[in-house]
């Protein structure tokens, strides 16, 4: 009698995982968002779904992955918009219309434009980029100032060490002179006696 794990993956769960991941690949979404979606449906963690996909399921769907990538490429060509900047709901609308599954209505266009308005604009990205550039320049200037201060302190330390060594040498010579004078006096006193 073999014992199976309580949390073992079933064929249906593997199939759901494959379908969702392939759909996300086709629509230009990320695998992580696919794993999160499957995780919610199966009450598993996204990490568990990712592990199952990478360790077992993906190997069985290589041709499906290639086909999904090809479809995504074709969809991008037809739409003329990079789906990286589009939310999933917009991708689904664009996907459906480009494949001829339905005609666009005014409501679809309005919905698309409202969602498009909510996505960060190129101007916002540019402003964020400029802000980050300024931060980098500020940090580089601060780093340069700290390096300069560090070099100044090193130079001062080196000069102090040299002065200290010179002072020790002078004191050593003075001590030797005092010792030699005392030795001279003692010898002279010894000779006189």
Curated annotation (Swiss-Prot):
The keyword NADP does not apply. Induction: Transcriptionally regulated by sigma-E. Transcription also requires the transcriptional regulator SpoIIID. Pfam families: Myb_DNA-bind_6. InterPro entries: DNA_bind_RsfA (IPR014243), Homeodomain-like_sf (IPR009057), Myb_dom (IPR017930), SANT/Myb (IPR001005). Disruption phenotype: Disruption of the gene does not affect vegetative growth and has no apparent effect on production of heat-resistant spores. However, the mutation leads to a considerably reduced spore resistance to lysozyme. The mutant shows some changes in spore coat morphology. The development of outer and inner coat layers is not completed. The synthesis or incorporation of several coat proteins is affected. The mutant has a strongly reduced germination efficiency compared with the wild-type and the complemented strain when L-alanine is used to induce germination. Keywords: Activator, Coiled coil, DNA-binding, Repressor, Sporulation, Transcription, Transcription regulation. Residues 1-61 form the HTH myb-type domain. One of its GO terms (molecular function) is DNA binding. It comes from the Bacteria. Transcriptional factor that regulates the expression of several late sporulation genes. Controls genes of both sigma-E and sigma-K regulons, acting alone on some genes and in conjunction with SpoIIID or GerE on others. Regulates, directly or indirectly, the expression of genes encoding coat proteins such as cgeA, cotB, cotC, cotG, cotU and cotY. Belongs to the RsfA transcriptional regulator family. This is Sporulation-specific transcriptional regulator GerR. The gene is gerR.
């Amino acid at each position: 009698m073999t014992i199976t794990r309580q949390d073992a993956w079933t064929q249906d769960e593997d199939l759901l995982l494959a379908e969702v991941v392939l759909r996300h690949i086709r629509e230009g979404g990320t695998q992580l968002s696919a794993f999160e979606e499957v995780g919610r449906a199966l009450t598993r963690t996204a990490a568990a779904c990712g592990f199952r996909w990478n360790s077992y399921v993906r190997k069985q769907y290589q041709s499906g992955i290639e086909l999904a990538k090809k479809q995504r490429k074709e969809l991008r060509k037809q739409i003329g918009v990079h789906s990286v900047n589009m939310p999933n709901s917009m991708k689904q609308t664009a996907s459906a219309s480009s494949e001829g599954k339905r005609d666009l209505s005014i409501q679809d266009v309005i919905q698309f434009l409202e969602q498009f308005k909510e996505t960060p604009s190129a101007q916002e990205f540019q402003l964020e980029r400029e802000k980050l550039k300024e931060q980098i320049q500020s940090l580089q200037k601060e780093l340069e100032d700290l390096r300069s201060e560090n070099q100044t302190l090193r130079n001062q330390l080196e000069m102090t060490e040299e002065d200290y060594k010179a002072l020790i040498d002078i004191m050593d010579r003075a001590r030797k002179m005092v010792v030699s004078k005392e030795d001279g006096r003692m010898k002279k006193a010894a000779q006189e006696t």
